[in-house]
From Swiss-Prot:
One of its GO terms (molecular function) is 23S rRNA (guanine(2445)-N(2))-methyltransferase activity. This is Ribosomal RNA large subunit methyltransferase K/L. HAMAP family: 23SrRNA_methyltr_KL. It comes from Allochromatium vinosum (strain ATCC 17899 / DSM 180 / NBRC 103801 / NCIMB 10441 / D). GO terms for cellular component: cytoplasm. The gene is rlmL.
Amino acid sequence: MSDHIFFASAPKHLGSLLAEELTRLGMAGAAETRGGARFSGRIEDGYRACLWSRIANRILLPLAQVSLGGPDEIHDSALEIPWEDHLTPDRTFAIQFDGQLQGVTNPHFAILQVKDAIADRFNRLYGRRPSVDPDDPDLRIHLYGNRDSLSFSLDLSGESLHQRGYRDAGSAAPLKENLAAALLLRAGWPEIAAEGGALLDPMCGSGTLIIEGALIAADIAPGLLRERFGFHGWTQHDEPAWQRLLAEARLRRTAGLKRLGSLRGYDVNPNAIRTSLHHLERAGLAGLAHFERRELSDCHPGREDDEGLVIVNPPYGERLGADEDLTQLYARLGSVLKERFVGWRAAVFTSSPELGKSLGLRATRIHSLYNGPIECRLLSFQIEPRYFVSHLPRPLPPEERSPGAAMFANRLSKNLKALRKWRQRDGIDCLRIYDADLPEYALAIDLYEGERRWVHVQEYAAPPSVDPKRARQRLREALGLIPEVLEVPGEQVFLKVRRQQKGRAQYERLAETGRFHEVSEYGLRFLVNFEDYLDTGLFLDHRDVRRLIGSLSDGKRFLNLFAYTGTATVHAAKGGAASTTTVDLSRTYLEWAGRNLELNGIRGPNHQLIQADCLRWIDSMAGQRRFDLIFLDPPSFSTSKRMHGTLDIQRDHVDIIQATMRLLEPGGRLIFSNNLRRFRIDLEGLAPFEVSDISAQTLPRDFARNPRIHNCWVIQHPESASNRRNGSDDEDRHA
């Protein structure tokens, strides 16, 4: 049989996902279109879509499309279609109309016109006609109006495909089965299931998400439970082809059930659990998923479940008329996820992005969907501490705090007090106030002040010898106390986890909020971002290095290599540099540097921003340009698709410094810095130069407890150092 063009309808905003699914099913030319997706193939392909599509509402086989001069042409247009090729006089049919037709205000008018045309054609051919059965017809005819165009199709589905056959009608506030499947697909459940991950719904309701998750994980065709489809009453139905598809689906089901992993659904309502178990049995999955009455606060992973997906459709304002404070419900859900499901992924389906913020988690992806007429968002999360950014735990009552928590609070308060006079004298607005002073509370805490006060907390990853539960408890104590001691709202406290970084991991984007805040340093203005990256855009330990650069820059040609957000360039320019050149591989950070320059009124051709691999750029500039002052602050280790090879600062620093010194004017200075704690400078390899260690002089007071936070040297050509020692240059007094 020749190929046909089929149309698969889908819930709003799911056309692209449906097209992807149809492509995976082997459908030719699957493409999103208005209201769903189109594909081509044989009748057997239409059957396959009915059997296997988890997302489609209906599979339609178009018969004709006509342009109408007016509503009175509907009857004659329908009369021309050979309905006898699809229906016999002793069978029944029903007609459904969607869309809008010019001149037709009541869809029932179009339905009656087509019904009469079918009756007239059959009466003319056979002297009798098929009857109309709106509830259980042998054949469903679908009409779609679009202005003056009317399309006629056969509905191969019969009942909507979301009706799998396992759920009772009338369940309270149902999530339709195909929407539930779409949520699971968007959340990455097929990949998680393939890797042996678990699925858990802490508010499972009638169990739809868990059952659809089981069908996906076990490779069970969603239409396998249905006894009847729309094509069964069609005169051209190919029963052998249908039986072949069923046989294949049954074999795949048998194989898939053998690899089905952990599936758990919890709900506080015992009736919901009973309904879920009933639906599970009707789906032929009795005993293969676990449903249990549990409060949200009692929700835990299964004992054997190390990772997986938590997916949930919490109540929202329009749903069920829930009386509970939904903000508190979302906050409790977020706390459960952060405390018990670290390493998992999560997906929350909500009608309110504002409620989603109460979770205290930064979404990695957001999809727009509809639950019936209600516009919703599917928020996808990775449950990792680096995504915990707000809504911190409330401080534990004094009677519940451990002695260690009290010591932590006291130390934080004392540190802040001890630094107060120094801050006021030097005008320091951004500083480190705690750096793992108590080993049990392995945190670095930085205070930023601008139009508001913010706290940036970095947790040092605990070694394997530390009990993860104890570490989480201490973190929770600390996060509860920080807002109290520092008098900062919880939403202005941001948490990151500091692990040993590989490649450019410390510069990789964590989120895309685009929220920047202005802070100041020695009268200069900088933009910081607490959410999107591991670091904020302002390295506080280099504060005195930047001030030194500013003091040495008057009239100088300044070069900033591995420039990050260009803060050193701002100091140089405001210190009177004749020109500045800022080089970094990242377009993102160069744009950030440009904003910092603009914020301080620095603009013009004398201030260049160059996106380039710094090592290649240094080599390319040899013999072409010279600079009087160079700041070289490379990462400890780096690799990038756009970078030539890798950079290991311990291994490569001599070569890099030698190459950079070729760009340094006689009499100039190279300031070389890095943050590798175990770094050892190779003085023998740098013997041709004068090397002065200024690490101690450039260590800010707030970092005194951690003297190895950075290493810093001034490197000069020998004649430059000799001249300065003889007093020919008085700039050394600034160092």
